[in-house]
A protein has these predicted regions:
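Conserved flavin/dinucleotide-binding core of flavoenzymes
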Residues: 16, 21, 64, 119-121, ...
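N-terminal Rossmann-like FAD-binding beta1-loop-alpha1 element of flavoenzymes
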Residues: 21-50
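Conserved Rossmann-like nucleotide-cofactor binding loop
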Residues: 31, 57, 291
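Glycine-rich FAD pyrophosphate-binding loop
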Residues: 40-67
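Dinucleotide-binding Rossmann-like beta1-alpha1 core, especially the glycine-rich loop
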Residues: 68-155
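Short, well-ordered coil/turn residues at beta-beta hairpins
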Residues: 82, 169, 287-288
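Active-site/ligand-binding neighborhood in enzyme catalytic cores
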Residues: 144-261, 268-269
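Mid-domain catalytic core of redox enzymes
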Residues: 260-378, 382, 394-395
Length: 449
């Protein structure tokens, strides 16, 4: 993910430069709440901030539930602790002491109906050598990987081909389906065949731009060295801790309604909600998914609307389960599922293994739904639970009888960063009037970050 969720720019002016008092923020997810917080931090009590969101609670795809006396995130569950944005925001809000890290155990990959160690020394699953994926792919693929540095490379600087096309051409299809896809399906709910290399592996693309003679060389250039501390972080108490603090600091008016349309009104805007009420504002921040932004931008920014409408989206469902303490799961943090396996889930997170035991409950999460399928929309809750238990039996050989189950569906919530995505994002911003801004996970990165 990128820093876009943490900075709101109006009319080309940097964060913190605001001339008006009434602000309407459409969307109460993390992007909308951070936007409201930034406005409040810049203007103090002079700002009148209204957040529109029809959901039963604020937070968008960040959603914390209680299971077995513990907080469990059933939307996004982690951020990249080695990036500066979230730790800096937590420190700014006085929450640095609530940051926690993973236990350090790694996940596995389920491929060819077997469990394998997650490949080491890769970038987004792209191998640095045949040894890094040995055992996961066949001998012919290993030979192709070993020979890749000696094959001529055609690379156009600045281009953004699908990561899957590049990896399949240079290393073979098995590397795509068994090493790259399991990682990307968790982030995008999509496949490498539909995600641009600059979104999925930006450092590799940059290394190729600057003269790496092969993809192997590009990966070796950018492999992270020995970095202290865990890669992923979370919050003690779940993301609800962050959401509550943002709301407390931003002190917005929350209108539990959708926005129907936005019209120019003098130098400002008239924001009409779905109850028919109109709210005047000097500036508006649209922090809703791309498909909703496309509809709301049709009148005030038609070129931006057309670009936003081009961004494909996926849906996902998450099932969190509490099972009997001592259930004999393996010590790893979970399982990422390769493309084409006969499972319903795309990932299994052994929450207690990943984050450490916080009580006597054994917690896990099952994720369902990929780009192009309708599982998140159509599968009933009891069907998801049956699939989850079946998959656990298939993968681990364990019969699980959940004590408690919580599920949630994220419909059209996962944008697909198709080749050329950055250009689409730039076009959306370029077409905006000066006092209309956008924010969200379809612009600069899907992470928190």
């Amino acid at each position: 993910g990128g820093p876009g969720a943490f900075a709101v720019t109006l009319g080309g002016r940097g964060p913190g430069v605001y001339r008006s008092l009434r602000y309407c923020v459409v969307g109460g997810g993390i992007s909308g709440l951070v936007a409201a917080y930034r406005i409040r931090a810049a203007l103090g009590e002079r700002a009148d901030i209204t957040v529109f969101d029809p959901a039963d609670r604020l937070g968008g795809v960040l959603r914390t539930e209680r299971m077995g006396g513990q907080a469990v995130d059933i939307g996004a569950e982690a951020f990249i602790a080695r990036r500066p944005e979230v730790p800096a925001l937590l420190a700014e809000l006085g929450l640095a002491g609530r940051q926690i890290g993973t236990t350090g155990v790694r996940p596995m990959v389920y491929s060819q109906a077997r469990l394998h160690p997650l490949p080491a020394d890769t970038v987004s699953g792209i191998p640095s050598s045949a040894a890094s994926v040995a055992g996961l792919v066949d001998a012919a693929t290993c030979a192709k990987i070993a020979a890749e540095p000696d094959r001529p490379l055609r690379w156009q600087s600045g281009s953004d081909p699908a990561l899957g096309d590049v990896v399949a051409d240079r290393f073979g299809e098995q590397v795509v389906t068994r090493s790259v896809d399991p990682l990307l399906s968790g982030v995008y709910a999509g496949s490498a065949v539909g995600i641009g290399i600059r979104s999925a592996a930006p450092t590799v693309a940059a290394a190729l731009d600057t003269g790496a003679a092969s993809v192997t060389e590009a990966v070796l250039r950018v492999l992270p060295g020995a970095v202290g501390g865990p890669m992923f972080g979370a919050l003690d108490g779940g993301y609800q801790v962050l959401l509550d603090e943002l709301v407390a600091c931003a002190a917005p008016r929350w209108v539990a309604a959708s926005v129907r349309r936005i019209d120019a009104q003098g130098p400002g805007w008239a924001v009409q909600d779905d109850t028919g009420r109109t709210w005047p504002a000097e500036a508006v921040v649209l922090a809703v998914p791309a498909s909703q932004a496309a509809v709301l931008l049709e009148v005030p920014a038609p070129r931006s609307a057309a670009s936003a409408a081009q961004i494909p989206v996926a849906s996902a469902a998450v099932l969190a389960m509490r099972v009997a303490a001592g259930t004999p799961f393996p010590p790893q943090s979970g399982v990422l599922v390769a493309t084409g396996e006969h499972l319903h889930a795309k990932a299994i997170t052994l929450t207690t293994r990943k984050w450490g035991a916080r009580g006597d409950a054994e917690l896990l999460r099952m994720s369902f739904g990929r780009f192009g399928d309708d599982i998140a929309r159509s599968a009933a809750d009891d069907e998801l639970q049956t699939w989850a238990c079946d998959d656990l039996a298939t993968v681990f050989g364990i019969a699980v009888d959940p004590i408690e189950v919580v599920s949630h569906r994220w419909i059209d919530a996962l944008p697909q960063y198709v080749p050329g995505h950055a250009e689409m994002s730039a076009q959306i911003r370029a077409g905006l009037p000066p006092t209309l801004a956008v924010a969200g996970n379809y612009l600069d990165g899907v992470g928190v970050p």
